[in-house]
Amino acid sequence: MQQARVRLAGTSPDDLDDICDDVRDIADTTGVNLSGPIPLPTKTLEIPTRKSPDGEGTATWEHWEMRVHKRLIDIDADERALRQLMRIQVPNDVSIEIVLED
């Protein structure tokens, strides 16, 4: 049977956990096997910028960072489960990637 690998990525870990709970509920209602959610390492994107707009004065820096959290879920590729999976309401800051594998 085919497996569907669902990759979730977003800046809010609470939103990711809510979507993982929705996927788990879908797997329970349709009776398909589920493994995960597997938390992947968090990627930290950091951008240092100068505080002063011109080049004068002391070199003081601000550091802006954004953390990207990721989750991985493997689910059996049942047609009913995948149809319900496509209907999940996803927030704007969360991206979902579904790949079918043998």
Curated annotation (Swiss-Prot):
GO MF terms, alphabetically ordered: structural constituent of ribosome; tRNA binding
Region (Disordered): 30-58
Gene3D superfamilies assigned: Ribosomal protein S10 domain
Record GO cellular component, one term: small ribosomal subunit
GO biological process, one term: translation
InterPro entries: Ribosomal_uS10 (IPR001848), Ribosomal_uS10_CS (IPR018268), Ribosomal_uS10_dom (IPR027486), Ribosomal_uS10_dom_sf (IPR036838), Ribosomal_uS10_euk/arc (IPR005729)
Superkingdom in the source lineage: Archaea
Keywords: Ribonucleoprotein, Ribosomal protein
Function: Involved in the binding of tRNA to the ribosomes.
NCBIfam families hit by this protein: uS10_euk_arch
HAMAP family, per database record: Ribosomal_uS10
Assembly mode: Part of the 30S ribosomal subunit.
Family note: Belongs to the universal ribosomal protein uS10 family.
Name of the molecule in the record: Small ribosomal subunit protein uS10
Organism: Haloquadratum walsbyi (strain DSM 16790 / HBSQ001)
